[in-house]
Each structure stands twice: as structure tokens, then as C-alpha cells.
């Protein structure tokens, strides 16, 4: 019986990094097994770096010395001890990292990619949409010219937030500016480019509906988190008056919440995040629930390379896969070079086919990037926006 013999938890980052302030640090767990194999997992930060890191120490107490093949058992054991697991982002994120690393170990022990253990390859290439590409873009021409640079890289889908510094409410002027941006993107890039509208859960219901109705004519692929997350009942009214499909899910932490949203018709495209909703196996369960109600999957993927590799392994197996978020071409070099394995070419992700998650760590670089502290903070710009756009 192979067990987890040692656990190393790394906070990695580059002080002053501004390209993605919500992930200027990343959290990595390294599990070393009794046979010497190494598995990597990742937990998200999003202005929660230190509490998530401490929660990872709690998960370590449950997982260490256990048989990592027993994923269901180990997960349930932590669930038993963690009183607030179902509602604690810190707990679910920490647990997700260990679950992902366990799969990496299992795949390496068996000499096969994780996706082969989840049903095998259904999608050989995964269409990506660009995110993070529009830093410092404020005017329509800024968005269009930057998007054209990414089209040259092969991207055919772009997510962006055109709402600048509007929060809770948005007036006619703010709506007009957003419409001007989306209109320019549609007219300049054409109908064959998909536009994905990011709201970041910033609006109350009435204003979200006004925004959605104003943007319907541009036929977005989806509109993401149009309403404050705690105002979930407003989604019923939103969907009654807006035609664009609704996408959300990165703030939902368990399959039961996803089941409620999809079964009640509050969401069309589910953006679960493997690194805060209990990992790879739970992602498969969530995807199956979503598929049974005719929904599609477009996993949230805004942090680091281990998250991406884990997400792609699930994507490979899904019959209801729609599209995959990608920040890779907006990452700083340190994050891009930390792990190698998967690649993105001509706007599509491709895994390496190597055992486990299919990635290899640059451990020397990892040692150089060890960091202790919170993410970068700018009192004039919330952590969740793309830099230079909240003005």
C-alpha cells in the first residue's frame, strides 16, 4: 500500500506583479509518496492566500500517511472533521489541492494520464478563450486593437469586462460605454469571433437586466455572473428578460449548490473551479449533474499551471465541454515557466499525454519564488478586475 509520506506547501509569487492581482501569488502542495513519486496540487488565493495556506495544514493532518488511492475515503474523512466545509472557501480550496495532487500520484504510479482514469479521451483538443488580455484597455479602439493581437495567436473567443468602475448600479452613460465597446468588438472582429461578457457579479438585479438587454443584440456566447452572488433569486428575473445564456459557478463550492442552480434553471453554462470545489472527482460529478439538465461546462481557470493541467484532464473526458478559460498568454514569465507539459497553440489547449497531470515542475524556479504574504493590494482597484480597467 502506497501512502503520502511527506507534504510540502509552497506560496509562490513575484512581488510587484500586477498583470493578475487576484493571483499574484499561487499556492502549491507537493505530496511525496512512499515509493518516491511526487504529486502536485494547487489552491486558489483571491485575497485569501494566508487563510487558505493555513487551511492546507489542516488538510495535511488528515491526508498524511494515508493511501492516496482512497480519494473518496480521504475526502470524506476531512469532511467529517471540517465543520464549515460546505460553506468555507478556505477549506474546500485546501482540500482541492490535496485531491488534485493525489490524482497526480495515482496517474504516475499507474503510468497513465489522469484523463484515462476518468473515462478516457473524448476531446482531443480544447478550444480556449482568452482572458486577461485587455489590461489597461478603456476605450473601444483599445479593446479591438488588443484583441486583434490575440487573434494572430489563434484565439477566436474573448472574455472581457466593459463596465469600468461601475458597481451595484450603472447609469445610462455607463451602459452606453459598455455597448460602444461590445459593438466595436463585434463589428471589427466579425460574427465568427465569440464575445463573452464578464460582469464579475457586480450588479444588483435591476441594473443587471438593463445591461443584459442592452448587450443582447451583439449575440454574446454568454454573460458571466451578471448579479451579485448573494442575490441568486434575481437570476430568475434576469433570465426572463435577457436572452443571452448565463454563465457562473466559480463561487459555488459543492455539487449540491451546482445541482440547485442547474435544476432550477438559474444557469446555462457552468463555470465550476476545480481548485475550490473539491477537485477532479467532484468536477466529474458536477459535470454529470449539469449534463443531465442539458447544461454545458466551461471551467473557471484563473490561477496557475497546476490548476490548468488538472482542469484540462477533466475537459478531455467531457461530452458537455463548451470552452476553456485561458490566461496563459497574459501570464508573467515566472508563472509560465513554473511547470511544463500542456501547451496552447492556435487558440486550443493540448495535454502532453504524460502520466499523472502531465506536467513537470521546475523545482529550482519554485525555490526562488517562495513568498510569504498577501497578494498585491490597490485600494483604487478591486482585486478581481483586470489591471487598469477600473476607471
Curated annotation (Swiss-Prot):
Site residues (Increases basicity of active site His), renumbered to this chain: 273
Needed cofactors: Mg(2+)
Domain of life according to the entry: Archaea
KW Metal-binding (keyword) present: yes
Keyword Metal-binding in record: yes
Top-level EC class: lyase
Active site: 200, 300
Record: residues binding Mg(2+): 198, 224, 250
Site features described as Transition state stabilizer, chain residue numbers: 325
CDD domains tied to this protein: MR_like
InterPro entries in alphabetical order: DgoD-like, Enolase-like_C_sf, Enolase-like_N, Enolase_C-like, Mandelate_racemase_C, Mandelate_racemase_N_dom
Induction text: Constitutively expressed.
Catalytic activity: D-gluconate = 2-dehydro-3-deoxy-D-gluconate + H2O; D-galactonate = 2-dehydro-3-deoxy-D-galactonate + H2O
Chain's role: Involved in the degradation of glucose and galactose via the nonphosphorylative variant of Entner-Doudoroff pathway. Catalyzes the dehydration of gluconate to produce 2-keto-3-deoxygluconate (KDG). It is also able to catalyze the dehydration of galactonate to produce 2-keto-3-deoxygalactonate (KDGal).
Family affiliation: Belongs to the mandelate racemase/muconate lactonizing enzyme family. GaD subfamily.
Complex and partners: Homooctamer.
Official protein name in the record: D-gluconate/D-galactonate dehydratase
Organism annotation: Picrophilus torridus (strain ATCC 700027 / DSM 9790 / JCM 10055 / NBRC 100828 / KAW 2/3)
Amino acid at each position: 500500500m502506497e501512502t503520502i509520506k511527506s507534504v510540502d506547501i509552497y506560496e509562490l509569487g513575484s512581488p510587484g506583479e500586477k498583470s493578475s492581482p487576484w493571483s499574484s501569488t499561487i499556492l502549491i502542495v507537493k505530496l511525496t509518496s512512499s515509493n518516491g513519486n511526487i504529486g502536485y496540487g494547487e489552491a486558489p488565493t483571491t485575497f485569501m492566500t494566508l487563510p487558505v495556506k493555513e487551511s492546507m495544514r489542516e488538510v495535511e493532518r488528515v491526508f498524511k500517511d494515508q493511501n492516496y488511492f482512497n480519494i473518496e475515503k480521504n475526502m470524506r474523512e476531512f469532511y467529517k472533521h471540517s465543520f464549515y466545509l460546505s460553506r468555507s472557501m478556505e477549506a474546500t480550496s485546501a482540500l482541492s489541492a490535496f485531491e488534485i495532487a493525489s490524482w497526480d500520484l495515482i496517474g504516475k504510479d499507474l503510468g497513465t494520464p489522469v484523463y484515462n482514469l476518468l473515462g478516457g479521451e473524448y476531446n482531443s483538443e480544447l478550444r480556449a478563450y482568452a482572458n486577461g488580455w485587455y489590461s489597461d484597455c478603456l476605450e473601444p479602439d483599445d479593446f479591438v486593437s488588443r484583441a486583434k493581437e490575440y487573434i494572430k495567436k489563434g484565439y477566436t473567443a474573448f472574455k472581457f469586462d466593459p463596465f469600468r468602475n461601475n458597481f451595484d448600479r450603472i447609469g445610462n452613460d455607463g451602459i452606453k460605454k459598455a455597448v460602444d465597446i461590445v459593438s466595436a468588438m463585434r463589428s471589427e472582429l466579425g460574427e465568427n469571433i465569440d464575445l463573452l461578457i464578464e460582469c464579475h457579479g457586480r450588479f444588483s438585479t435591476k441594473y443587471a437586466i438593463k445591461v443584459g438587454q442592452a448587450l443582447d443584440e451583439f449575440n454574446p456566447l454568454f454573460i458571466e455572473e451578471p448579479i451579485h452572488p448573494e442575490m441568486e433569486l434575481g437570476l430568475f428575473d434576469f433570465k426572463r428578460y435577457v436572452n443571452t445564456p448565463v454563465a457562473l459557478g466559480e463561487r459555488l463550492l459543492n455539487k449540491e449548490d451546482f445541482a440547485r442552480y442547474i435544476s432550477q434553471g438559474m444557469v446555462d453554462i457552468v463555470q465550476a473551479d476545480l481548485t475550490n470545489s473539491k477537485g477532479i472527482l467532484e468536477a466529474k460529478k458536477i459535470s454529470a449533474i449539469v449534463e443531465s439538465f442539458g447544461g454545458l461546462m466551461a471551467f473557471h481557470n484563473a490561477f496557475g499551471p497546476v490548476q490548468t493541467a488538472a482542469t484540462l484532464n477533466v475537459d478531455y473526458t467531457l461530452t458537455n465541454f463548451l470552452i476553456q478559460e485561458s490566461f496563459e498568454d497574459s501570464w508573467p514569465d515566472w508563472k509560465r515557466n513554473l511547470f511544463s507539459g500542456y501547451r496552447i497553440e492556435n487558440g486550443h489547449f493540448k495535454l502532453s499525454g504524460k502520466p499523472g497531470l502531465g506536467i513537470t515542475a521546475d523545482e529550482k524556479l519554485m525555490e526562488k519564488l517562495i513568498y510569504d504574504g498577501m497578494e498585491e493590494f490597490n485600494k483604487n482597484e478591486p482585486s478581481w478586475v483586470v489591471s487598469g480597467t477600473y476607471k
